[in-house]
């Protein structure tokens, strides 16, 4: 991998980390409280309504801002896309497929599978995004190149 390719991968990692940092967060639920609420709801046959069940389940979410991203690999996908694997906050491994470049910015468009539970955490889009830069020390770059 030459210096130009290294610089391009570094820029992709920085942009992707900042995008996640500004637009997403993760949450987990207290397992005991979740089980207690499920018992009370009992698939619609319990002592609380569906609306109450949904409200209670949402209220026990424990949110965490994204404060660390570790990039683990880059590979070329079956459709010549760039597949990027990373770990958020040391607990949420995920990946994205970069295959579309924005006509406006000339950079990759990012998309993520929100709502998936991985290691008891869920990635969720923030209600209000920001434009801050993630501290460089919190981005763990991979320099292995594209596999």
Go through each PLM region and give its residues:
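N-terminal export/targeting and maturation segments
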Residues: 1-75
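A generic structural signal for solvent-exposed, polar alpha-helical segments
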Residues: 25, 30, 47, 101, ...
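Intrinsically disordered, low-complexity regions enriched in small/polar residues
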Residues: 26-29, 43, 88, 97, ...
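Aromatic-enriched hydrophobic runs in primary sequence
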Residues: 53, 73, 93-95, 135-145
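Exposed beta-strand-loop-beta-strand "reactive/processing" segments of non-cytosolic proteins
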Residues: 60-101
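A short, surface-exposed beta-strand/turn
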Residues: 93-119
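C-terminal partner/receptor-binding element of secreted or periplasmic proteins
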Residues: 112-147
